[in-house]
Amino acid sequence: MSKSNNNTIIFVTIAILVVGGLGGYLLFGSNTEVGEKTESKKNDFIDINGAGASFPFPLVSNMIEQYFESNPTIRINYQSIGSGGGVRQHTEKTVHFGISDAPLKDSQFADAPNSLHIPITIGAVVVPYNIPGVDTGLKLTGEIVADIFLGKITKWNDPAITTLNPDVELPDKAIVVVHRSDGSGTSFIFTSWLAEVSADWEKEVGAGKAVEWPTGLGAAGNEGVAGVVNSNEYTIGYIELAYVIQNNTPVAALENPAGYFVLPSLETASEAARGAGDDLPSGKDTWSKVEILNSPGSNSYPVVSFSYMLLYQELNVIPDMDEKKAKALLEFTLWAVHD
């Protein structure tokens, strides 16, 4: 997913709302001035390190490449290790920024005081499948998806699925569930949605970055889940939309609260997030209650969420931070949410 394409689902007004006063928050020292261009001698590189969610990794890597083209002395390294790892490294101050698909819980916010949440993108969690001969047309309700991941629906030709898909030839084959094996913001988004649409899921499993999966195979990262689904027949999983676009993987149309079955796309994710900027916390407050799942609207895809860049209001709390790095990080952040 390119940065230019993703502008259709980045709500710049949200970013401006949150980071409009960013220069007042991101402090290094009394001599640091926001907007003063970072300068360095030829070959005097400034290294910025980040880690976290694989959910927005295609976007983040593309942004880094674009930024380096016009800022060749600033090298931004991002490790796609999952939201749990990003939050942990942000809290431990071993990276300059983290990225998480889930906002910090109140307890995590307390462990990392003066953290900022900066929404850098809005993305969709999709349900890819691998059924030979079925490339399009599969429809699923939230309850059916929950029952599949609970291990209660075990065959592709289960009556619950075939009744909903009379024109799709579904095989008498066992469903192979693929889920994340690592702490994951994608899992948090997906399980939060399942908990909203299925009382059984809420009671038996609940929502979280890491849950006790009732069934299935584990794989690390969105890349791992996508790889297992793409290479193994009769599988089903959950991944971020960008990984489907990259691999042209079949995905299910999911039922939204208005009763429409909607395929994931940049347009339907944007529709779900429309108006999200009307009632958001400031960047320096807790975002633990923020979600945009199951948004109203006939064309709204139901499993949509922000990804958050995590920074400290005072960057000098990070042990290896210096003034050049602070300026470079601030300039990249402002570029990422404005351009």
Residue ranges: model-predicted function:
Residues 2-12, 16, 24-339:
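Flexible loop/hinge segments at secondary-structure junctions
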